[in-house]
Amino acid sequence: MKIITAYQEFKEFRNSIKSISFVPTMGNLHKGHMALIDKAKSYDSHVSASIFINPLQFNDASDFNNYPKSLDDDIALLSKHGCDSVFIPDSSILENIKEIKAPDTATYLCGMNRPGHFDGVLTIVNKLFEITKPTRSFFGKKAVSYTHLRAHETPEHGGMR
C-alpha cells in the first residue's frame, strides 16, 4: 500500500490512475470503515483512503485534542483489507483552504448542537475531493447528513461529485 503525506505528491500520483474509489476518514478505523473499503474495491481498480483529523469540524478544542489517534493500527488495517493507497496529510492542507458554508438545512441535523461542524466537514471534504479527484466516494451511514449537505452545496463550490 502506498502511503502519501504531501498533497502535491497525491495530486501527481492521481494523474497516473484512471479511476479511484475514495474513502475519507478521520482515522480510528473500525469494521464500518473496512466495509467501505471492501465495497470500494468492488468498483474500481484503485482504492484510496484518507486519514485526517479535521480541526475545522470541532467547536470544542478539547474534543479535537482528545480524538482517538491510532495511525499505525489504521495503516495496518487498510493494508490488510487491500487498500491501494492512503493519503495522510498534515495541517498544511488547511492553508488557504476555501471555506464552505453549510446550507440552512444543517441546523435541522445535528448542526444545531454543533455550530460550525458541518462547515468544517464540507470544507475538508471539498479540499480532499480537489486533491484526490475521486471517481466514487464512500461514506458510512453516520455520514448520511454529510452527503445530504454535499448534494446541496452551491455550484460555485463545485457541487456534488
List the model feature ranges, each with a label.
Residues M1-K18:
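Positively charged, low-complexity intrinsically disordered leader regions
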Residues K18, D44-S45, G82, K133:
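Residue-level detector of structured alpha->beta connecting loops
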Residues T25-A40:
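Di-metal (Zn2+ and/or Mg2+/Mn2+) metal-binding site signature of metallo-dependent hydrolases
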Residues N28-L29, G140-Y146:
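Active-site glycine- and acidic-residue-rich loops that bind
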Residues K41-S62:
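ATP-dependent adenylation/pyrophosphate-handling site
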Residues N65-K69, D74-F138:
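Divalent-metal (Mg2+/Mn2+/Ca2+)-assisted nucleotide/phosphate chemistry catalytic cores
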Residues T147-E156:
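Conserved small/polar residues in nucleotide/adenosyl-binding loops
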Residues G159-R161:
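Hydrophobic alpha-helical segments, chiefly the membrane-spanning helices
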